[in-house]
Amino acid sequence: YFVFLFVFHRWNCNQSDKEPVDEEDADPAINPHSSYLEEEESGGNTSSGPAFPVLANYAPAFPGAVGYGRNADGARGSNNREIYVVTNLNNSGAGSLRDAVSQANRIVVFNVSGVIDLNKEVLVFKDNQTVLFQTAPGDGIELYNGRTSSTNANNLIVRYMRMRTGRQVSGSDNIDAGGAAYGHDQIYDHCSFTWGTDECFSLNNDKQPKGLYNITLQNSILGQGCQNHSCGGLVQTSDKEGVTVFRNLFIDNK
């Protein structure tokens, strides 16, 4: 089943509307301070649209999470979770974002802001991760000159990520700014995927046996594809459950 709800609206991509994370919160994955979608739930129904699947014994990823991926719990459900603080803008090494997402079961927060040059490499997310870009101070974090992948990641929460791929990545015209080929229970919220040279964000199972299901992409921007054929997104999931694409802005794609 597929749920596609496209509501095009003005979305301020500046970091001025990002939510602060109070220092007193011991676990930012449990209380990531979001209230973007006002809901009145009754058996999965909301005031903002039709019923989405809700597992009765599961808390949503964060307040305002909707759709098939809303029950992803990131690192929250892991008994051996740890909080990793990104302390520099390096592409690799201790304190870098790449090092932060190299291991499963992590809540990733930031005490640095600026541009991270991925050096034409893929940033790969792992199982049971909660990556909270809105915790960065100042103007936040921007990823550049590379791409992200959530392939084979299960129980993933990514919020407020800004990915700018660019034409120069490997000299190729078939690079997506982000996406996944297989995996389940993933949610992306208030992200922007731009300057892709194939699609900006793709969920392409392509008959992979592991499947791609229980995914939500919400409140995000997919735009400014860099090639004549570049598109906003490609969605081809497996037969299990589905994908929710909700309240996103697709703009300036071919």
Report each predicted region and the residues it spans.
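Right-handed parallel beta-helix
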Residues: 128-133, 154-165, 182-198, 210-235, ...
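Primarily auto-inhibitory N-terminal propeptides
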Residues: 49-63, 71
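Extracellular beta-strand-rich solenoid/capping regions of secreted or surface-exposed proteins
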Residues: 98-104, 115-132, 139-160, 165-183
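Structural detector of coil-to-beta-strand junctions
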Residues: 147, 174-177, 200, 229-234
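Hydrophobic alpha-helical signal peptides and transmembrane signal-/tail-anchor segments
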Residues: 1-7
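Acidic Gly/Asp/Thr-rich repetitive segments characteristic of extracellular carbohydrate-active
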Residues: 40, 62-108
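Bacterial Sec-dependent N-terminal signal peptides
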Residues: 7-48
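Binding-interface segments
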Residues: 206
